[in-house]
Design a protein with these regions (language model features):
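Basic/aromatic recognition patch in beta-strand/loop cores that engages polyanionic ligands
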Residues: 33
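Catalytic core of pol beta-like nucleotidyltransferases
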Residues: 1-26, 36-41, 52-108
Length: 108
């Protein structure tokens, strides 16, 4: 995929997520190899979707999965989307979240 192609896919994903969540969406953070600038041609797009009131992980995951799948298919790239409550994002000691806070790039 061309370098700019994954960015268009990410923009489309963020746009659809905004449409679903509205004011509950507090941000989208790109993390992993794309955020570090180390991505290869086949690298996926790793995102944390930061929400107000993300009290039921699987409910939000099930809302995000079809969006990520649809955009992934449209752009021939893999998007992973993990929902997380804003307070968990700010305070978690989970290594994935700590790493996303350290090297992540806010895209929304």
């Amino acid at each position: 995929m061309p370098v700019s192609g994954w960015r268009v896919a990410l923009e489309d994903f963020v746009s659809e997520v905004r449409g679903v969540y509205g004011p509950r969406l507090r941000g989208v953070v790109l993390y992993g190899s794309r955020a570090r600038g180390e991505a290869g041609e086949a690298s996926d797009i790793d995102t944390l979707v930061i929400l107000d009131r993300c009290s039921h992980f699987w409910d939000d995951f099930n809302l995000l999965s079809p969006i990520a799948s649809r955009v992934s298919l449209e752009h021939d790239v893999v998007i992973s989307a993990i929902p997380i409550d804003i307070s968990d994002y700010e305070e978690s000691r989970n290594p994935l979240v700590v790493n996303a806070r350290r090297e992540g790039v806010a895209v929304a």
